[in-house]
Structure formats: C-alpha cells, structure tokens
Amino acid sequence: MKYLWLFLIYAIGLFATDKTLDIIKTIQKLPKIEVRYSIDNDANYALKLHEVLANDLKTSQHFDVSQNKEQGAINYAELKDKKVHLVALVSVAVENGNKISRLKLYDVDTGTLKKTFDYPIVSLDLYPFAAHNMAIVVNDYLKAPSIAWMKRLIVFSKYIGPGITNIALADYTMRYQKEIIKNNRLNIFPKWANAEQTEFYYTQYGEKTPMILKYNIQKATHENIASSQGMAVVSSVSSDGSKILMSLAPDGQPDVYLYDTHKKTKTKITRYPGIDVSGVFLEDDKSMAFVSDRSGYPNIYMKKLGLKESAEQLLYEGRSNESIDAYKDSIVYVSRENLNEFGKTVFNLNLIALNSKYIRRLTVNGSNQMPRFSMDGRNIMYIKKTSQEYAMGLILLDYNQSFLFPLKNVKIQAFDW
C-alpha cells in the first residue's frame, strides 16, 4: 500500500487506568473513496445499495467519501487529479437468471481492480445487509479497524397496541425491519442467546405468569426456560452462551439468578429484601454488575457470582442510576439528572471502568435509554427521545462520534444487538 495515511486508533488512553479510548489523529488525510453505482439491470436497487454503502463508509470514520454514477471506463488519471484513492462500484448483475448485488473495488494508485464481491439477492428488502457487507469488504481491504458490527442484527420488541408487542429483527440503521413473533401477546425484553445470532431469549406474558422463552430463528421453535410471578427477564448472556443472568420474583421481591444453559439449573445469587435486578456479566463472566435500591434509590452494585458474596456499591454520584450494560470491565448506565432549562428531566448515558473513578458522559440532552455495547465493546447503541425526535442512537467510542437513525412508525420496548 502506497497511501500516505495512517490509522492510529490505539491511543495513550487505551492503556491508561480509566480505559477511555482516545484517538491520536495524524496530520494525514483520510483515504478518499468515490462510491459509484450502475443503472444496468436494476437501477433503483443499485441506488439503494449505493446510498447505504456510502453512509456506512462515512459512519466508519475511516474514509473521505464522495458519490457518483457510473461513468464508463475508470479514468484513473482524472481520479488521481481529484486525489481519489479508491473507487467502489455497486451494481446488479444477472447470472443464470438470478440477480446478485456486486461490488467492484478499484485501486486508483495502482490502476487495477482489487476486489469483486457478490451478495445474492434473496429478498429485495435485505439490501441494507448487502451494503453493510460491502462496506466491511472495503474497510478490510485497507486493514482499518473492524466494522464487522455493521452486519449484526438488531432484535427488538415493538408496541402494537394495549397489551400487545411483537418481536422483530432489523439492521443497525433500522432500514430493514421484519416481525418474526406475532401472537397478540406481550413479548418483551429480547436478548441474543449466542454470538451467531441464531437464537434469542425473550419474556412472554401468558394467561398467568411471565415466561422466559428461547426462540430459534432458523427452526422457528421455542424452548421454555423459566417462569416467575411478577417478573421474569433475561438481562445478560455469558460470552460463550453457557450462562445467563435472570431477574425473577418468585416470592414477590425480584432477585438476580444465574442459569446454566447446559444443566438447565438456576441459582439465586442475590438476597437483599428489596429490589435487585438487571444483572450483567463483568470481568470475563466472573462477576456481575446489577441495579439495586440498597441505597434507598436505584444505584449500581457489583458482586461475584455467589449468593454469599458481598455486594459493592460502584457509584456515589447521582440519585438514580439504572438501565445498565457491561463489556469486560466497562459499564454504561443511564443516570437521571435534574430538570433542564425547559423543566424536563434528562436521562443521560455515562461510561465507567472498574479500575477508575473517571465518569465519561456520552450524551447531553433528552431521554437516552437502553444502552447496549457492541460485541467488541467499542460502540454503544441506545434509544434517544426528545421533543423533536425519536431515534436509535449509535456512539463510536473510539472516535467520540454519534449518529441517530430515526424510528418512524415504531415504538421500541427493548432491544439487543
């Protein structure tokens, strides 16, 4: 590679005690890529691919992106004058009577076609995933930090009417959405059961008690996991999927339980005569953080995975800290704050690390709820609501950048990715 740029993603902060990911930016510019599309075979579909691919590359923070239509043969001399380094051409090809999405990646500096990537068009509405995979191919060609998270599915529960929520799947931009569980019941709190995203847990309210079910997407089959009076929710899944943390209330007061997916057994691991909920695995699944009212208000605590292990308070700032997620030794949580200048309560996201007292604020206004780490812990998705917008939010921690994807005609109860 003869390009004159460097991706210095790992910074001093990566090794500092607060684990905050800072970025060292070089004086070099980002590689410039021109994203083009062909009007042959299916111009509308190619245009959709083109738009999503360009936005993905912009979102990655790894490229300077421009957009254009196909202009015949690649004029490398003209592109060099424009200081363009790469050209990504998306098109729809027809082979053996079947349409496929195609990406061709040209290296302007060497004047050659470097990559051809085909993605079958199984269903027209799946075009966002074709574009996401294309973005990953382009990104990997430069050996930039991974953006594989872009192709992951979002599973979410959406409100339909009184007492009715359906479970649906989506891509991270929410362009693609498909309902997969529709039964005129309350289906809530979906949580992925494995890294492959072939199964997920969710809570269904039946005629008597809430039940935790495990659903296999490929087989469309259910497995009963647990039930409990009042509350039954899966809040965290271990990295290998062998254990889950559940909030159950068999005796009226909710506690956190550890469930072994192989032995099909559950063990109570909190016993405070109040509220202990929302356990999330920490420290390579050896401990957990959870929300409790032991302080007289919702706050975050930590303990090892045993009933007799003591609980340690993690936060001493704020009077209402809740809705948490964790990745290794990092915790993101929602903090309720004082009324803003418009007289409304603000719910902001904050990030902390176990070995640091530093609190990193991630949002500044509105109601920001349900933070969820990506699989690599470098990004966070959440729901943002203000008087002007309702959207799925994305925070790139390495770059201190955030994006909002409007949620139109859908109200989300809970989600996971």
Curated annotation (Swiss-Prot):
Belongs to the TolB family. Part of the Tol-Pal system, which plays a role in outer membrane invagination during cell division and is important for maintaining outer membrane integrity. GO terms for biological process: cell division; protein import. InterPro entries: 6-blade_b-propeller_TolB-like (IPR011042), PD40 (IPR011659), Tol-Pal_TolB (IPR014167). It holds the Pfam family PD40. The Tol-Pal system is composed of five core proteins: the inner membrane proteins TolA, TolQ and TolR, the periplasmic protein TolB and the outer membrane protein Pal. They form a network linking the inner and outer membranes and the peptidoglycan layer. HAMAP family: TolB. It is found in: Periplasm. SUPFAM superfamilies: TolB, N-terminal domain, Tricorn protease N-terminal domain. The keyword Oxidoreductase does not apply. This is Tol-Pal system protein TolB. Residues 1-16 form the signal peptide. Keywords: Cell cycle, Cell division, Periplasm, Signal. GO terms for cellular component: periplasmic space.
